[in-house]
A protein has these predicted regions:
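Signal for well-folded cores of large energy- and translation-related assemblies
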Residues: 13-16, 39, 59
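Short, flexible, solvent-exposed loop/turn segments with mixed acidic/basic and small polar residues
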Residues: 9-11, 33-34, 56-58
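Feature captures the catalytic cores and cofactor-binding loops of soluble hydro-lyases/lyases
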Residues: 26-52
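Ribosome large-subunit tunnel/peptidyl-transferase-proximal elements
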Residues: 1-17, 27-29
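General secondary-structure edge motif
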Residues: 17-18, 34
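Alpha-helical transmembrane segments of helical membrane proteins, especially in multi-pass transport
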Residues: 21-22
């Protein structure tokens, strides 16, 4: 899992993202280009968590607006 908009965007541009998390309390001006790129790359976006919950999911202390699950993190069953 990658946290942070810059690193998440790089992974998305490289087509390595399976699922994107965008915090529901993130600044829309900040995440709008990222959401557009998710749509362009046909990546599902989950907006159920806020920035603090997303940080907890990523096991980091600083709230984050964006995180992604990369293809290498996904195990098919």
């Amino acid at each position: 899992m990658i946290a942070g908009i810059k690193q998440s965007k790089k992974a998305l541009e490289a087509s390595k993202v399976k699922l994107a998390y965008v915090a529901n309390d993130a600044d829309e001006n900040v995440i709008k280009p990222f959401l557009h790129l998710c749509k362009k790359k046909a990546v599902e976006v989950n907006r159920e968590l806020d920035m603090k919950e997303l940080a907890k999911l990523c096991k980091i202390e600083v709230p984050t607006a964006v995180a992604v699950v990369t293809i290498s993190n996904v195990v098919e069953i």
